[in-house]
Amino acid sequence: MNLGTPLKPGATRVLLLGSGELGKEVAIEAQRLGVEVIAVDRYADAPAMQVAHRSHVISMQDREELKRVIGLERPDLIVPEIEAIDTEFLLELEQGGQRVIPTARATNLTMNREGIRRLAAEELGLPTARYAFAASLEEMRGHVAQIGCPCVIKPIMSSSGKGQSVLRDPSQVDEAWRYAMEGARGASDTVIIEEFIQFDYEITLLTVRHCNGTSFCPPIGHVQIKGDYHESWQPMAMSPAALAEARRQAEAVTTALGGYGLFGVELFISNDRVLFSEVSPRPHDTGMVTMISQNLSQFELHVRAILGLPVGEIVNLAPSASHVILADASFDAVRFEGLEQALEVATSKLRLFGKPDTRPGRRMGVALVQGKDTDEARGRAEACAHAVRMVPLS
């Protein structure tokens, strides 16, 4: 792809659907290559909007609003960064010649756990936890009885761990169903019931489909709390056999989804047995560690790939870790304190996302640190993150 000049005739325009912290880093990397960036989200002053050329505040599940903005901006590429989008409309746009990253089908399938699980397990034959889908409480009771407890209950459409729970006793079925419905995104009333896997560890394998083939980043270990990313580190130590199988599964599912871009493939590993979990066709929360761990961050890799540019060699610079900085209260605006102490941690870097307000558990920043090994890096990242405090503006 030949690239134009921003704000001039012939500019290469990227429309970001979703403007959070991941979208912000994508916008920055795109602008480094002279791309004109338009950021879209449901609320004003979202992180990517603060660095984009223009922005729009709309519901991305409203196809008329999407149609209006796309018609106004006439982007070369539509780059979804979140799940809360009318993906059926993206399919129609793609059929009409609009380029959606990586493909509209990939975006549509992966926002729905039923679609991606059926693709991975039933079409591609990838090993997964035992599972079933239920569209009613009574149907869920039957599947829980078959799969057994403990099991994991998730809405088929949700993000950041919303609506997910571990069902440890059949008496909790009603509560798990209610929690799933409260956390579900969109109009779906279906859940997935999964066998509870006693895995040794879980990884994200960042997989890049680009003009010269498929490339892999070193595996990323991570910890989730209530289904949401809390810390990650790279590289995650794996046996050669487990890594080879992880790459095989990641390449299979990303090839089936198609298109160019970076995918976050989540996998469970137990005694070198690798089980497919989920895939996101975009930069991944756990991949924020690559801003310090690699020569090319996941965001630069994504931008290069979607623009049809070579990716080159991906190099791990040092054992590294990331740790989230979370709000613990609701404020309209905050100031950050403790930054001096945070940045006294050896090799540390901070990314404060610039979100306009806080609520308990909202991710407001991330600490990034290197170490002599991942254990040291994880300890440093935690110390750096925990030094940062948020206080309301008086």
From Swiss-Prot:
GO MF, one annotated term: phosphoribosylglycinamide formyltransferase activity
Superkingdom to which the source organism belongs: Bacteria
Residues given in the record as Mg(2+) binding sites: 266, 278
Positions with a binding annotation for N(1)-(5-phospho-beta-D-ribosyl)glycinamide: 21-22, 81, 285, 355, 362-363
InterPro entries: ATP-grasp, ATP-grasp_carboxylate-amine, ATP_grasp_subdomain_1, PreATP-grasp_dom_sf, PurT, PurT/PurK_preATP-grasp, PurT_C, Rudment_hybrid_motif
Pathway: Purine metabolism; IMP biosynthesis via de novo pathway; N(2)-formyl-N(1)-(5-phospho-D-ribosyl)glycinamide from N(1)-(5-phospho-D-ribosyl)glycinamide (formate route): step 1/1
Catalysis performed (reactions): N(1)-(5-phospho-beta-D-ribosyl)glycinamide + formate + ATP = N(2)-formyl-N(1)-(5-phospho-beta-D-ribosyl)glycinamide + ADP + phosphate + H(+)
Main EC class the enzyme belongs to: ligase
Nucleotide-binding keyword on record: yes
EC number: 6.3.1.21
Coiled coil: none
UniProt: ATP binding residues: 113, 154, 159-164, 194-197, 202
Cellular component aspect of the GO annotation: cytosol
Record keywords, A-Z: ATP-binding, Ligase, Magnesium, Metal-binding, Nucleotide-binding, Purine biosynthesis
Assembly notes: Homodimer.
HAMAP family given in the database record: PurT (MF_01643)
Family that this chain belongs to: Belongs to the PurK/PurT family.
Task performed by this protein: Involved in the de novo purine biosynthesis. Catalyzes the transfer of formate to 5-phospho-ribosyl-glycinamide (GAR), producing 5-phospho-ribosyl-N-formylglycinamide (FGAR). Formate is provided by PurU via hydrolysis of 10-formyl-tetrahydrofolate.
Matches recorded under PANTHER family: FORMATE-DEPENDENT PHOSPHORIBOSYLGLYCINAMIDE FORMYLTRANSFERASE
Protein name (Swiss-Prot/TrEMBL): Formate-dependent phosphoribosylglycinamide formyltransferase
Species assigned in the record: Pelobacter propionicus (strain DSM 2379 / NBRC 103807 / OttBd1)
